[in-house]
Amino acid sequence: MIKPPLKSRKKIKKNIIEGVAHIHASFNNTIVTISDRQGNALSWATSGGVGFKGSRKSTPFAAQVAAEHAGRAALEYGVKNLEIRVKGPGPGRDSAVRALNATGFKITSITDVTPVPHNGCRPPKKRRI
């Protein structure tokens, strides 16, 4: 039985002027997603996806490269203005914001959306090194 050919997802050329950059900076990796105002992802990149492995993923330089990669892909959609939302305590927070600024976007606002518990779950035990 012959399988029908898989439909490739072609990039639809949209003209989106305003976007939202979500930067999730954990201690091990940095994920940068650029979406439109409704939350539909336009482009994304991670520190591991752009070629860094192991402990080098958690460096500020890896977050900078990931933000540049996601930013260049979002420029193809016509994104000009960015609202930045940063989540997490990782080392790539500031360098990812600087990289998006250097890519040529006009940054309208920077918001910290790190979730803070109102004394919810018990945190993991402290590390003894």
From Swiss-Prot:
Recorded hits in Gene3D superfamilies, A to Z, give:
Ribosomal protein S11
Which keywords does the record carry?
Answer: Ribonucleoprotein, Ribosomal protein, RNA-binding, rRNA-binding
- Judging by the UniProt lineage, the source's domain of life is Bacteria
One annotated GO molecular function: structural constituent of ribosome
Q: Cell cycle: is it a keyword of this entry?
A: no
Task: Read off the InterPro entries from this record.
Answer: Ribosomal_uS11, Ribosomal_uS11_bac-type, Ribosomal_uS11_CS, Ribosomal_uS11_sf
Entry annotated with the keyword rRNA-binding:
yes
A Gene Ontology biological process noted in the UniProt record is: translation
Q: Name one GO cellular component term.
A: ribonucleoprotein complex
Subunit info here reads:
Part of the 30S ribosomal subunit. Interacts with proteins S7 and S18. Binds to IF-3.
Q: Provide the family line.
A: Belongs to the universal ribosomal protein uS11 family.
Tell me, in a sentence or two, what this protein's role is: Located on the platform of the 30S subunit, it bridges several disparate RNA helices of the 16S rRNA. Forms part of the Shine-Dalgarno cleft in the 70S ribosome.
This protein's name = Small ribosomal subunit protein uS11
